[in-house]
Amino acid sequence: MANSIYSTTMISNGGRDGRVFSPDNTFVQNLATPKEMGGQGGNDTNPEQLFAAGYSACFNSALSLILSQNKISDANPEVEITIELLKDDTDNGFKLGADIKVTLENMSQQDAEKFVEQAHQFCPYSKATRGNIDVQLDVTAQ
């Protein structure tokens, strides 16, 4: 891909009850189907948790950059992202939804919403999902 500044590779085997790992084995994680989906659940992760973790960290980084560009250093951004696996009636399969809850300190609700929207436009995960999954933004200023 043109203009790549970073890439990473993950390999999976065994589907939802298998494992995912990097070729150099610096990341190795067992997977388990959640009980809600008929699986064993347990302490292992699943694709939705991995997606939520990546999206949350990326969104928080984008928001922190926006805040820094606006010379705001005391907002202490917290980003909580819930990824839902939803039934897709168009093909009797599944689709994803995302609920993004952001808390910012020491600013007005209006400013918090403005900065979160800017981060949502800038975040690579938000760009990748825009128009593809339902996303709900919930912003709280404290």
Swiss-Prot record:
It comes from the Bacteria. InterPro entries: KH_dom-like_a/b, OHR, OsmC/Ohr_fam, OsmC/Ohrsf. Gene3D superfamilies: 2.20.25.10, 3.30.300.20. GO terms for biological process: response to oxidative stress. Belongs to the OsmC/Ohr family. This is Organic hydroperoxide resistance protein-like 2.
